[in-house]
């Protein structure tokens, strides 16, 4: 018998569902979604075998009261079952996309195909079910198993380790012929507790034997890492094993999706936007070119949600510089989204969104060597941008990171390295791996391709956050050094290409005109004024 807290998303089906569950002997309490999430979490803590069930409902998941917050705070901590709107909320919470299904269904019987596993074990296949929906989940992340579908549309998902699952259809409906049995098998599956040590040991053994993990195995491993379920010695051994063999794109993608799924949510816009970011660790100690480029790109009409952190290896990371400008690193997600909408730029401070990183920090500090975590930063932007310009500290990483971006489903992106720097530069050829609609093209760019004068790397040397702030203030006000102007122009020109403006030379000239107008600095002061 389960103790079920049924979240009512203001839908009459909630009570049909409650009647079905109670008829099978389960305890059910119902709360509407306008109740604060904290109140419901405290109520769940008083229940002996708690299961959170998310009801159907109108609208979209983000507008369903406390449901998104409950998913963020509780997944992996107790079983969660979502139905229709609840299923869509689960898809979004794990990094998937919810959009129009192409038709509006109200009480239509469809025969779905399922995998015959877990809650679907022993059920008729195809299984007649009742569908009431106009939205559907897609771009399902690696951590979720798609266990039922209809004509290519996702009808059910599950996360085995977290004991979270969702049904797009209505199991409580009379049109779902084996719905009562499905609900009982789902509750039985949900209440089976997996021991992390037991489920992770085969994955660790593969690493010790220098074998490559699948994306799902890597996802499972790093989900345990960010939840603090791995012992320090296990994490150290796993990271070193992967480093010695060389990290595979599927392993990087699995780790990235695990961190994204466990990140604090950001209200993702439906318009085109990008990130421009570097891994750091190139040892160049240059001015913060990508951060300056984000403001200039916004002044050029692009939208940039830049993800960043404080510096580890240089004097000034992106967040160090922003703090020196008086920009609030702890700005909440809604205010950051508003800045992106209105100013064209926002900054998402990594520790605010990825609190699970703290479990790995002691091991990373003890190892004192680069590991997979060093390349994850640019890949775990909680806004899930469809476009990205990513610089890497080593030319050997250019193609693997591009392949990882393909696995992660980016629409268009470029991974670059140039003469020891993790960005487009003009002192040496820039190595590029560009992803566009699933295809990766490798090429090189020089200063001539941008119509710009080459400069020496030493001319881009930076200093402390305060020194870089002063340098970039002059640059963004249109009074900057020519080498600094050219560096930013090249990077923003490349970002413009990812938005469909293919002519790099024309792009660079546009950027220089905007830079010299001083309008980019207005974005800095406006963002700082938002507090």
Swiss-Prot record:
Activity: how regulated: Cooperatively feedback inhibited by tryptophan.
Statement: the UniProt record of this protein carries the keyword DNA damage: no
Protein name: Bifunctional protein TrpGD
Keyword Amino-acid biosynthesis: yes
Pathways per UniProt: Amino-acid biosynthesis; L-tryptophan biosynthesis; L-tryptophan from chorismate: step 1/5; Amino-acid biosynthesis; L-tryptophan biosynthesis; L-tryptophan from chorismate: step 2/5
GO-annotated molecular function: anthranilate phosphoribosyltransferase activity; anthranilate synthase activity; magnesium ion binding
Catalytic activity: chorismate + L-glutamine = anthranilate + pyruvate + L-glutamate + H(+); N-(5-phospho-beta-D-ribosyl)anthranilate + diphosphate = 5-phospho-alpha-D-ribose 1-diphosphate + anthranilate
EC numbers for this chain: 4.1.3.27, 2.4.2.18
Domain Glutamine amidotransferase type-1: 3-196
A cellular component term, taken from the record's GO annotations: anthranilate synthase complex
Chain segments carrying region Anthranilate phosphoribosyltransferase: 202-531
SUPFAM superfamilies found in the cross-reference section: Class I glutamine amidotransferase-like, Nucleoside phosphorylase/phosphoribosyltransferase catalytic domain, Nucleoside phosphorylase/phosphoribosyltransferase N-terminal domain
InterPro entries, per the entry: Anthranilate_Pribosyl_Tfrase (IPR005940), Class_I_gatase-like (IPR029062), GATASE (IPR017926), Glycosyl_Trfase_fam3 (IPR000312), Glycosyl_Trfase_fam3_N_dom (IPR017459), Glycosyl_Trfase_fam3_N_dom_sf (IPR036320), Nuc_phospho_transferase (IPR035902), TrpG/PapA_dom (IPR006221)
Keywords for this protein: Allosteric enzyme, Amino-acid biosynthesis, Aromatic amino acid biosynthesis, Glutamine amidotransferase, Glycosyltransferase, Lyase, Multifunctional enzyme, Transferase, Tryptophan biosynthesis
Function: Part of a heterotetrameric complex that catalyzes the two-step biosynthesis of anthranilate, an intermediate in the biosynthesis of L-tryptophan. In the first step, the glutamine-binding beta subunit (TrpG) of anthranilate synthase (AS) provides the glutamine amidotransferase activity which generates ammonia as a substrate that, along with chorismate, is used in the second step, catalyzed by the large alpha subunit of AS (TrpE) to produce anthranilate. In the absence of TrpG, TrpE can synthesize anthranilate directly from chorismate and high concentrations of ammonia.
Superkingdom of source: Bacteria
Family matches, as Pfam families: GATase, Glycos_trans_3N, Glycos_transf_3
Self-association and partners: Heterotetramer consisting of two non-identical subunits: a beta subunit (TrpG) and a large alpha subunit (TrpE).
Protein family: In the C-terminal section; belongs to the anthranilate phosphoribosyltransferase family.
Binding site for L-glutamine: 57-59, 88, 134-135
Active site, UniProt feature: 84 (nucleophile), 170 (for gatase activity), 172 (for gatase activity)
GO biological process: L-tryptophan biosynthetic process; phenazine biosynthetic process
């Amino acid at each position: 018998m389960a103790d079920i807290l049924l979240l009512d998303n203001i839908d009459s089906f909630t009570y049909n569902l409650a009647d079905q569950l109670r008829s099978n002997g389960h305890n059910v309490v119902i709360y509407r979604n306008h109740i604060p999430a904290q109140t419901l979490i405290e109520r769940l803590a008083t229940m002996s075998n708690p299961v959170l069930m998310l009801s159907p409902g109108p609208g979209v998941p983000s507008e369903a009261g406390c449901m998104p917050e409950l998913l963020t705070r509780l997944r992996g901590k107790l079983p969660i079952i979502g139905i229709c709107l609840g299923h869509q909320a689960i898809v979004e919470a794990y990094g998937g996309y919810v959009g129009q299904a192409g038709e509006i269904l109200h009480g239509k019987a469809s025969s779905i195909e399922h995998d015959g596993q877990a809650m679907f074990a022993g059920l008729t296949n195809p299984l007649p079910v009742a569908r009431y929906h106009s939205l559907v989940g897609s771009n399902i992340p690696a951590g979720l198993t798609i266990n039922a579908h209809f004509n290519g549309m996702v009808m059910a998902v599950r996360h085995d380790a977290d004991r979270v699952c969702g049904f797009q259809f209505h199991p409580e409906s009379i049109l779902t012929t084996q719905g009562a049995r499905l609900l009982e098998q789902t509750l039985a599956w949900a209440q089976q507790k997996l021991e992390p040590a037991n489920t992770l040991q085969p994955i660790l053994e593969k690493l010790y034997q220098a074998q490559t993990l699948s994306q799902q195995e890597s996802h499972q491993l790093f989900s345990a890492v960010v939840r603090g379920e791995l012992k320090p010695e296990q994490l150290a051994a796993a990271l070193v094993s992967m480093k010695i063999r060389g990290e595979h794109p599927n392993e990087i993608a699995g780790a990235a999706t695990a961190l994204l799924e466990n990140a604090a949510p950001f209200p993702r816009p439906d318009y085109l936007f990008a990130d421009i970011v570097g891994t750091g660790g190139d040892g160049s100690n240059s001015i913060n070119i990508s951060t300056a480029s984000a403001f200039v790109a916004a002044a050029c009409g692009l939208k940039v949600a830049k993800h960043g952190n404080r510096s580890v290896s240089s004097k000034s990371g992106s967040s160090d510089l922003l703090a020196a400008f008086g920009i609030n690193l702890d700005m909440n997600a809604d205010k950051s989204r508003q800045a992106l909408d209105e100013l064209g730029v926002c900054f998402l401070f990594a520790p605010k969104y990825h609190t699970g990183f703290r479990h790995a920090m002691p091991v990373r500090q003890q190892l004192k060597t680069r590991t997979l975590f060093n390349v994850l930063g640019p890949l775990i932007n909680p806004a899930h941008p469809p476009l990205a310009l990513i610089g890497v500290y080593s030319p050997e990483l250019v193609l693997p990171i591009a392949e990882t971006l393909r696995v992660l489903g980016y629409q268009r992106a470029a991974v670059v390295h140039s003469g020891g720097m993790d960005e487009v530069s003009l002192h040496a050829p820039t190595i590029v791996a560009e992803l566009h609609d699933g295809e990766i093209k490798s090429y090189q760019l020089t200063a001539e391709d941008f119509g710009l004068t080459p400069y020496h790397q030493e001319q881009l040397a930076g200093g402390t956050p305060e020194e870089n702030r002063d340098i970039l203030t002059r640059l963004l006000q249109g009074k900057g050094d020519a080498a600094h102007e050219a560096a930013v122009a090249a990077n923003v020109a490349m970002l413009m290409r990812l938005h469909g403006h293919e002519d790099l030379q024309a792009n660079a000239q546009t950027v220089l005109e905007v830079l010299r107008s001083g309008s980019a600095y207005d974005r800095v002061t406006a963002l700082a004024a938002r507090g």
